[in-house]
Each structure stands twice: as structure tokens, then as C-alpha cells.
From Swiss-Prot:
Superkingdom of this protein's organism: Bacteria
NCBIfam families for this protein: PRK00913.1-2, PRK00913.1-4, PRK00913.2-2, PRK00913.2-4
Residues holding Mn(2+) 1: 270, 347, 349
Functional summary from the UniProt entry: Presumably involved in the processing and regular turnover of intracellular proteins. Catalyzes the removal of unsubstituted N-terminal amino acids from various peptides.
Listed name of the protein: Probable cytosol aminopeptidase
InterPro entries: Leucine_aapep/pepB, Macro_dom-like, Peptidase_M17_C, Peptidase_M17_leu_NH2_pept, Peptidase_M17_N
Originating species: Rickettsia africae (strain ESF-5)
Length: 500
């Protein structure tokens, strides 16, 4: 794991030294001495716009001209226009710095802060850069037995020179705790589905959360049957692995304080069931539990900080498998709410899991607000691509707050419509509703949201986040490698912290 340290005095023991330059290409007063020490290497570089323009995110790694000393490389990082810098951009810049240092096999890095930024304190700037670097240090390679030497290399430490190391370290400790929650979400999402069975996943939740003071209850199929959870159980009935409902309760607030419920879809592997998916990308369905992982990660972050709020998480863990005992297209299931659903397509299974999970959360905990998170529909990816998750809500204020926070942490949300005409499209001839719409390929993500909405009680504020397009990525980003992104943890943690 990357070591991050904050020190008041500059050290010369790091192999790489990072300096920040904005698009005005002017040396900070605190860089003049360093530039002279390195025989004008920094000033010569920024005077040549073919080499360096100062635009945001540009990283220039230059071998040091000093024969003696530990510093082998100067790393010049572009800030761009200071007025356009955001916290998210500063974090991503930290990630880019770490990635370039890794590529150049620089094992220890020192960061010299700029004094040209007025919109952020030096402590905030330093903690954000460190947070981005820490997030970018994540790896999931435990099943690789033949890593090449270049693939094994990792930056060992980052040392940031700041005038208030104690205060900066406190800020970073919170960000590190949140990043470690993101790492749990990434880890469990990346885990192969033959390893993370519902039972194993549930055990990992217990092991991670109980030491943080979170009450965790793992409900098996017998109890779910007694509760009337026919929708969730129907999805998992084709699998040899027993379905689980994991209930997490963190009581940090007063007894009369309102409760927020987070509900996550945890389809451990989704073949589509009898309505079988195409085989080409089916291996990616190990990520179909990304919503549940985001819920668990959020509770790790909240409980780890001991925030004074009451929050519950409910995740339905199932496998959607074809077998002689699998659910059939045309089956009718009775949900915990008593409403019935005709299963016209067994590959529209996530909404069935959520139907019972959100109802359970409302019945048991009487929350003021329910936010469900799910890799629910391919339709949302067609609509929004891999940049935005879809946000559906019955409350404008709730939706606006989520969208605002999403912009701030760069986990973006786009408000999607709810409408009575969409709701009418899930009416069934033989049951209370069908799990797909009656117009083929029309408004798929909206239809799915309306299915869940039928299980939200009157007076409960509700938001549904369809994260199918953003939960995993086929390419690396500034904050992590390809694979599971950990989307939703930082969004929900900040939403809960700021608005409850």
C-alpha cells in the first residue's frame, strides 16, 4: 500500500520531486531556488511550449542534471487555469502524477506545493493530491502468478512538503478512510464469481463492518420465504448457492433522528437465467453486484468516520442461473409487499431483487429516505454512455442534491424522467405488474425505475441510481486501473455527510 507522509521540512531523499506550474508558465517564488539548484532545468522547460504548456493534467518527467543527491527526476505537473480547478480535478492530478511516476519506476516522490492557488488552502490542496495518488495506487492482481518486473513495480511513498503537516495529515486520514472503502467496493466487484458466492460475500461484509460497530444480520432463504420475498427468491432459485439478504445498521445519530436507507442490487453473477444472455461479454456479469458493493462501501466510510447519523444498508445477494429449477418466463411471483409480478424476462432480474429489498428496508426501519443503487439496465448505458449514471427520483430536492454532489466528486448523475405513461407500460394481464414493458426496447431504464417505484411507500423520499454504465470500465482512469471503479461510494458518503 502506498505510504503518504506530510512534513514541514523539505527532504532530498526522494527519487522524484514534483512541482506545479499553471498555464501562465511562471515560476512560484518558492521554486526559484530549486530551479537554480537544478541549473535552470524547470525554467528552461516551461519556456519551451513545445515541451510544456502548463495545461491541466500535463505531466513532464525530466531526468535531473545534478550528479549528486537522491533526486533523479523532476516531475512538472500542469495546473491549467487556476479558476477552473476543482477538488475533483486536483485529486485526478494526484492520480496522474502517481501513474507517471510508476511508469518511470520512481519509487519515492516528494511534492513541493505551489503558492499560486488562492481558492484552496495548502492543506486542502495537499490532501486532495495525496487522495488522488492513493486512489490511483489500487491494484487487483492477486490471481496473477507470472507478473513481469515492470508490472510488479509500485511507488512506495509520497512525501508532501507543507507548512502545516499535522492539519494536512488529519484531512488526508479522512480521505484515506474513504479511499479504503472504495477499495473494498472495487475488490469485491473484481472478485471472480466462483469465489464470491452469496455466502462468502456476506461473510466479508460481516468481517469488514462489525469491527466498525455496525450491526449486520445475514438472512437466509428460509427466513426470506417466511417474510414473503418471492421476487428475490425467484431470481436465485436456479442456483445451487443459497441467496442471502444482508442487513447493515449503523446507529450514529440520536434515536429520534431520521434514518437513511441504502439498498443495493447484488446479483453475484447474471447469466440472464432462462432468458440467456449472449456469451460474448457474459464474463463481465461478475460486476452485476456493483450496486450492493457501493452500498457496503458507503457504510464502511460512514461508520469509519463515526458520523452522527443513522443509516441502514440492505443488499440482496443472488445468482441468476439457468437450471431445471430456474424461474421461467411467464412465472408469477408474490413480493413481500403482497403485490404480484409476472416475470416476462428472467434477465430483468435486478428489479425483482430490489422490489423485496426496498420493501424490507421500509417495513423494518421506517426510513425518511431510500436510495437504491443498481447496475440495472443496459438501456442506461445506451442513453448516457460511460460518463453519467441515471438518477430517477420522486423528490426534486433529493435529486438536485445528489446531482450536485456527483459533480463535486466526479461521479456524475443525469436526471431521468418518471411519467405515468411509463408506469402504465408495466401493467400485466395476469398479475399486478410485469417486469418488462409492453413496448419492445422502449424506455428500458425508465420502465425499470417505475417497477421499483411501485414498492416505495407514500411519503418516502426515493432516488434510484442506475449505475450500469459506470460501475466498471474497460480502460484505466486517473484514479484507478480498468475493472471495478468503486462508483457511488464517494458520491453517497459526501451526500450523507453534507445533507443529513
Amino acid at each position: 500500500m502506498l505510504n503518504v507522509n506530510f512534513v514541514n521540512e523539505e527532504s532530498s531523499t526522494n527519487q522524484g520531486l514534483v512541482v506545479f506550474i499553471d498555464e501562465q508558465l511562471k515560476l512560484d517564488s518558492n521554486l526559484i531556488g530549486l530551479d537554480q539548484q537544478h541549473h535552470g532545468l524547470i525554467s528552461k522547460t516551461i519556456q519551451n511550449k513545445l515541451q510544456f504548456t502548463g495545461k491541466y493534467g500535463q505531466i513532464k518527467v525530466i531526468p535531473s542534471v545534478i550528479k549528486s543527491g537522491e533526486v533523479r527526476y523532476l516531475i512538472i505537473a500542469g495546473l491549467g487555469n487556476e479558476e477552473k480547478l476543482t477538488e475533483a480535478k486536483i485529486e485526478e492530478l494526484g492520480g496522474k502524477i502517481l501513474q507517471h511516476a510508476t511508469g518511470c519506476k520512481i519509487s519515492t516522490i516528494g511534492l513541493k506545493l505551489t503558492n499560486r492557488i488562492s481558492r484552496f488552502t495548502s492543506q486542502t490542496f495537499a490532501s486532495l493530491v495525496a487522495s488522488g495518488a492513493f486512489l490511483a495506487s489500487y491494484r487487483f492482481d492477486k490471481y496473477r502468478t507470472t507478473l513481469k518486473e515492470a508490472e510488479k513495480f509500485a511507488v512506495e511513498s509520497i512525501e508532501i512538503f507543507t507548512d502545516n503537516s499535522t492539519e494536512t495529515a488529519k484531512l488526508f486520514e479522512i480521505k484515506k478512510l474513504i479511499a479504503e472503502a472504495v477499495f473494498f467496493t472495487r475488490d469485491i466487484s473484481n472478485e471472480p464469481s466462483n469465489i464470491k458466492t452469496p455466502q462468502v460475500y456476506a461473510e466479508r461484509i460481516v468481517d469488514r463492518l462489525e469491527p466498525l460497530g455496525v450491526d449486520v444480520d445475514v438472512i437466509g432463504e428460509r427466513e426470506m420465504k417466511n417474510l414473503g420475498m418471492g421476487a428475490l427468491l425467484g431470481v436465485g432459485q436456479g442456483s445451487q448457492n443459497e441467496s442471502k439478504l444482508v442487513v447493515m445498521e449503523y446507529k450514529g445519530g440520536s434515536k429520534d433522528a431520521p434514518t437513511i436507507a441504502l439498498v443495493g442490487k447484488g446479483v453475484i453473477f447474471d447469466t440472464g437465467g432462462i432468458s440467456l444472455k449472449p456469451s460474448s461479454d457474459m464474463h463481465l456479469m461478475r460486476y452485476d453486484m456493483g450496486g450492493s458493493a457501493a452500498v457496503v462501501g458507503t457504510i464502511i466510510a460512514v461508520a469509519g468516520q463515526k458520523l452522527p447519523i443513522n443509516i441502514v444498508g440492505v443488499v440482496g445477494l443472488v445468482e441468476n442461473m439457468p437450471s431445471g429449477n430456474a424461474q421461467r418466463p411467464g412465472d408469477v411471483v408474490t413480493t413481500m409487499s403482497g403485490q404480484t409480478a409476472e416475470v416476462l424476462n428472467t434477465d430483468a432480474e435486478g428489479r425483482l431483487v430490489l422490489a423485496d429489498a426496498v420493501w424490507y428496508a421500509q417495513e423494518k426501519f421506517k426510513p425518511k429516505c431510500v436510495i437504491d443503487v443498481a447496475t440495472l439496465t443496459g438501456a442506461i448505458t445506451i442513453a448516457l454512455g460511460n460518463t453519467y449514471a441515471g438518477c430517477f427520483s420522486n423528490n426534486d430536492e433529493l435529486a438536485d442534491k445528489l446531482i450536485k454532489v456527483g459533480e463535486e466528486v466526479n461521479e456524475k448523475l443525469w436526471r431521468m424522467p418518471l411519467h405515468d405513461e411509463y408506469d402504465a407500460m408495466i401493467n400485466s394481464d395476469i398479475a399486478d405488474m410485469a417486469n418488462i414493458g409492453n413496448v419492445p426496447r422502449a424506455a428500458g431504464s425508465c420502465i425499470a425505475a417505475h417497477f421499483i417505484k411501485r414498492f416505495i411507500k407514500d411519503g418516502v423520499d426515493w432516488a434510484h441510481l442506475d449505475i450500469a454504465g459506470v460501475a466498471n470500465s474497460n480502460k484505466a482512469s486517473a484514479l484507478g486501473p480498468k475493472g471495478a471503479v468503486g462508483y457511488g461510494v464517494r458520491l453517497l458518503e459526501k451526500f450523507i455527510k453534507e445533507y443529513t
